[in-house]
């Protein structure tokens, strides 16, 4: 789907979001690694300063986890670090097409993949519960490069061309991506498993709206 075809029905806010992500993608690929990481961390700090609702939610959640008041200095410092790390996540994800997969392989220590190997060797396929820990995009790209037939489900973002942007990138490194709400989604995932594939599902986020 082209950018022109995808603009139908977009609000101006959605258009700004789309081009913001496109600019971020370009920047991540163009900058040297060390410079990009530092710049995105600064961007994370800026987001903490201006995104009042997200900042308030982060402070409230971390205060509960740490057993401190939301205004506590430790809670605030931890929240700022979380925003920096989230910005780093986007840098690493968008930089993937510009990074050698062998350099990623050299930095990954794979633990527990023998369980996948046994399941696939037996022709059973499997479903893997994953969490938003580290960078799932990097791990998925690495696993696909290693030959694991990975499929996953992603939230159908708006505007549509933003979803397609992420879909093209992930499918570009070998991960099949199914959008939420797609007719026959469960059947397609089950078919992927029956074909001796691996379905990776984020188990720490509920997209149903029911908590």
Residue spans for each PLM region:
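Membrane-anchoring hydrophobic helices of lipid-metabolizing enzymes
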Residues: 2-130, 163-168, 172-175
């Amino acid at each position: 789907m082209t950018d022109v075809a995808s603009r139908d029905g977009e609000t101006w806010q959605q258009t700004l979001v789309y081009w913001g992500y496109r600019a971020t993608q370009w920047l991540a690929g163009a900058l040297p690694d060390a410079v990009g990481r530092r710049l995105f961390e600064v961007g994370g700090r800026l987001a903490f300063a201006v995104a009042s609702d997200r900042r308030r939610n982060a402070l409230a959640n971390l205060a509960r986890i740490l057993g401190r008041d939301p205004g506590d200095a430790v809670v605030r410092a931890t929240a700022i670090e979380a925003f920096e790390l989230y910005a780093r996540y986007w840098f690493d994800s968008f930089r993937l097409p510009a990074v050698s997969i062998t350099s990623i392989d050299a930095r990954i220590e794979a633990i527990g993949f023998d369980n996948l190997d046994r399941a696939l060797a037996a022709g059973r396929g499997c479903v893997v519960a994953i969490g938003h820990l580290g960078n799932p995009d990097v791990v998925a790209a690495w696993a696909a490069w290693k030959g694991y037939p990975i499929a996953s489900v992603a939230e159908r973002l708006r505007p549509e061309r933003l979803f397609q942007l992420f879909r093209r990138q992930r499918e570009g490194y070998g991960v099949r991506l199914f959008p939420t709400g797609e007719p026959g989604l469960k059947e397609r995932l089950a078919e992927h498993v029956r074909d001796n594939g691996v379905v990776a599902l984020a188990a720490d986020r509920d997209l149903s709206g029911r908590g």
